[in-house]
């Protein structure tokens, strides 16, 4: 969930008094960090996923399912392996907001080998099994985005009751007890309390109820004058949801900024594809996704900042919550698509510019810094700005956006990274692995083909709202950039060059660095390099990418320094192309293509893969993932959200009143348990026998490792 500093949390009054102190020193820390690391080059591709889980307890006698408040106990046991052998564990476990939630990641990041795609699902299975071994027979670990009856009466085990009138309560919620907040670190309750106090009132999350034939209005707890609203009133309703996130290491800062920008327009598209949360507080709603719920759950803006009162005590009108979609692009190519006025702190901006930060990055940081810190620890108030970054991370980590631009940590081997944050958690490891591998492959296609998905920020914002509508994946259309002839020619040229070079290299010395076991890192990998570069042979430095081969042509320096060096022109559209660049496309058209408009994300990935030699098992696994993505995008398979709705609407106990009763909730979660264990076949959701199709393994076979070593692409151990 972000920075977990150790120490004693300050009260809101103490934290508020230090807001400018944190802001001033956070800016200084970023400037110092930037100048230390801005010229860092040559980091290899590394990537990893984060899956959040909910622990569910079943009462099979009473036919009731509740969230089990066991996270602290489970984490203590799960972390024993890491403490004993930090470098040898296959998974890492961290706390999340809910006392019923845990977050799992791979023990080590995956790298640039094609074979790594075959490890992801197996590692996810291992994580699930690792937790399951610690659970009682009536408990289950589930990768569901939201517990359907979160906030309904008696939803926790042990039972806990909200205390809205208790001044010592962090949430003061009518529905969400403090006991459901993770107790093992003070950050979570501190954030809950301080967000409420800064706002001046409890957070207000409003969802339209799904109106069925017998839905009773007003909904229980609905605000005055809004009878059809399901009201949620605590941070836990949002931060108590689970998601699926990915982080990529770029070769340098320029590539990180480009990836940040190119992936941002895809965030609402992936949100719609992964929609998985239609039920809140035991009611079917008109929303399929968690995003606006979380956004409202941490909205600490005052009435002045929200435009409900004249500015007096506050400096800014702020358009969005601190949890929302990005507000500006970072790369030079994206600048002209920053079409929404950006609110930022002018003093912070000037300090950054004077400190040597360029305009686009300076306004991005200055925009983050319009927010006050909402969590501060006494031991972290005074820091060394030349070495520490906690004040910067304090603000950075509490701006939860669809994308996150992440500088390297101090004194670390980790490079510049970007985090992809919109996806909802899926029921099965197969689905989660498919989403992860698809997005990683897409980043390689973007860099290798120099694709341009840049879309005006205003249209991306519009897409974010569209993505959350009921059954948006099948019914809605999204603003998307048309493919240009330049893009199509570039992709075809890159593919042809890669295949020709691989063949030539193999014939020349038998040591083909383009053996298909590597993935490109470095935005110089596009086909539009100079003629001189294109004629140069593939040396170890240019092709191996520090042990990770490239699928396309690249420059001579291996890491392709990611600088502009003529590549910016690949992203610059002609005046003719600027006309009617953007069209409303369906999810099917975006993923599978529309003739003469856009080739489709999946066909682009398949084109890229044709230039790579992939071992048989990995090829089989990737193919199953791509087919799954294609079928869901086409509507042949339904989203988790749609499947959940259908399960509720067809349940014999459902009374056409929008209510998900305890029995319906129990049966739904039991069915989900069967799916994730491979015992329940759901053709509409996953097709037939999905779980037996992939060839996922938790290791790279020895024979393949020998081949990789022979070809100079050694697997890191």
From Swiss-Prot:
Pfam families: GCS
EC number(s) from the headed UniProt entry: 6.3.2.2
GO biological process, alphabetically ordered: axonogenesis; glutathione biosynthetic process; glutathione metabolic process; imaginal disc-derived wing morphogenesis; response to copper ion
Gene3D superfamilies assigned: 1.10.8.960, 3.30.590.50
Pathway: Sulfur metabolism; glutathione biosynthesis; glutathione from L-cysteine and L-glutamate: step 1/2
A Gene Ontology cellular-component term: nucleus
Catalytic activity: L-cysteine + L-glutamate + ATP = gamma-L-glutamyl-L-cysteine + ADP + phosphate + H(+); (2S)-2-aminobutanoate + L-glutamate + ATP = gamma-L-glutamyl-(2S)-2-aminobutanoate + ADP + phosphate + H(+)
Enzyme class: ligase
Record keywords: ATP-binding, Glutathione biosynthesis, Ligase, Nucleotide-binding
Residue ranges with Low complexity bias: 492-518, 551-567
GO molecular function: ATP binding; glutamate-cysteine ligase activity
Region of interest: Disordered: 484-576
Top-rank taxon, per record: Eukaryota
Sequence similarity: Belongs to the glutamate--cysteine ligase type 3 family.
Role description: Catalyzes the ATP-dependent ligation of L-glutamate and L-cysteine and participates in the first and rate-limiting step in glutathione biosynthesis.
Name of the protein this chain belongs to: Glutamate--cysteine ligase
Lineage, top ranks: Eukaryota, Metazoa, Ecdysozoa, Arthropoda, Hexapoda
């Amino acid at each position: 969930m972000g920075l977990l500093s150790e120490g004693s949390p300050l009260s809101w009054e103490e934290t508020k008094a230090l807001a400018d102190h944190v802001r001033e020193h956070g800016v200084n820390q970023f400037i110092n960090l930037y100048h230390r690391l801005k010229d860092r080059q040559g980091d290899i591709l590394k990537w990893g996923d984060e899956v959040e889980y909910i622990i569910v307890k079943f009462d099979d006698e009473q036919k009731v399912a509740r969230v089990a408040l066991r996270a602290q106990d489970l984490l203590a046991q799960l972390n024993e392996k890491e403490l004993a052998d930090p470098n040898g564990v296959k998974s890492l476990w961290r706390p999340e907001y809910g006392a019923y939630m845990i977050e799992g990641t791979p023990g080590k990041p995956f790298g640039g080998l094609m074979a790594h795609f075959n490890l992801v699902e197996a590692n996810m299975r291992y994580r699930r099994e690792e937790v399951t071994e610690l659970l009682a027979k009536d408990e289950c670990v589930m990768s569901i985005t939201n517990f359907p009856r979160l906030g309904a009466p008696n939803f926790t085990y042990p039972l806990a009751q909200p205390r809205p009138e208790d001044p010592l309560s962090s949430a003061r919620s009518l529905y969400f007890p403090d006991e459901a907040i993770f107790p093992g670190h003070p950050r979570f309750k501190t954030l809950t309390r301080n967000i409420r106090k800064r706002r001046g009132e409890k957070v207000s999350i409003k969802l339209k109820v799904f109106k069925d034939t017998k839905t009773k209005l007003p909904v229980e707890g609905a605000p005055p004058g809004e009878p059809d609203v399901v009201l949620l009133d605590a941070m836990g309703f949002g931060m108590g949801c689970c998601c699926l996130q990915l982080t990529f290491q770029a070769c340098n800062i320029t590539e990180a900024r480009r990836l940040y920008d190119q992936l941002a327009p895809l965030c609402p598209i992936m949100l719609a594809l992964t929609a998985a949360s239609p039920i809140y507080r035991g009611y079917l709603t008109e929303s399929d996704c968690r995003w606006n719920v979380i956004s409202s759950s941490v909205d600490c803006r005052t009435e002045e900042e929200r435009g409900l009162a004249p500015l007096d005590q506050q400096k800014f009108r702020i358009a969005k919550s601190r949890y929302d979609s990005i507000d500006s692009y970072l790369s030079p190519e994206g600048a002209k698509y920053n079409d929404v006025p950006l609110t930022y702190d002018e003093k912070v901006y000037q300090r950054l510019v004077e400190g040597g930060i360029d305009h686009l990055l300076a306004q991005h940081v200055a925009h983050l810094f319009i927010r006050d810190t909402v969590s501060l620890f006494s031991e972290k108030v005074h820091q060394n700005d030349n070495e520490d970054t906690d004040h910067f991370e304090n603000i950075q980590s509490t701006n939860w956006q669809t994308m996150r631009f992440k500088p390297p940590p101090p004194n670390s081997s980790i490079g510049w990274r970007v985090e992809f944050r919109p996806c909802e958690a899926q029921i099965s490891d197969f689905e989660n692995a498919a989403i992860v591998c698809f997005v990683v492959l897409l980043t390689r296609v973007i860099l290798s083909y120099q694709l341009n998905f840049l879309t005006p920020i205003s249209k991306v914002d519009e897409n974010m709202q569209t993505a959350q509508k009921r059954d948006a994946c099948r019914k809605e259309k999204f603003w998307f950039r048309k493919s240009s002839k330049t893009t199509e020619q570039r992709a075809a040229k890159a593919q042809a060059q890669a295949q020709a070079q691989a063949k030539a290299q193999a014939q020349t010395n038998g040591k083909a660095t383009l053996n298909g076991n590597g993935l490109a890192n470095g935005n110089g990998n596009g086909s539009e390099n100079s003629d001189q570069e294109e004629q140069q042979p593939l040396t170890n430095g240019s092709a191996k990418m520090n042990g990770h081969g490239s699928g396309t042509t690249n420059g001579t320096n291996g890491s392709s320094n990611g600088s502009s060096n003529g590549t910016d022109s690949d992203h610059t559209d002609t005046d003719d192309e600027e006309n009617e660049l953007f069209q409303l496309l369906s999810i099917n058209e975006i993923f599978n293509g529309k003739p003469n408009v856009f080739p489709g994300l999946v066909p682009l990935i398949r084109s890229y893969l044709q230039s790579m030699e992939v071992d048989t098992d990995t090829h089989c696994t990737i193919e199953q993932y791509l087919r799954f993505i294609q079928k869901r995008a086409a509507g042949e398979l339904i989203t988790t959200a749609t499947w959940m709705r259908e399960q509720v609407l067809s349940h014999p106990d459902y009374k056409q009143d929008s209510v998900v009763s305890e029995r319906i909730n129990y049966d739904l979660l039991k069915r989900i348990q069967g799916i994730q264990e491979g015992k329940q076949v759901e053709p509409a959701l996953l097709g037939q026998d999905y779980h037996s199709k992939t060839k996922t393994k938790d290791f790279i076979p020895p024979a393949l490792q020998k081949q990789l070593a022979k070809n100079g692409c050694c697997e890191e151990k």
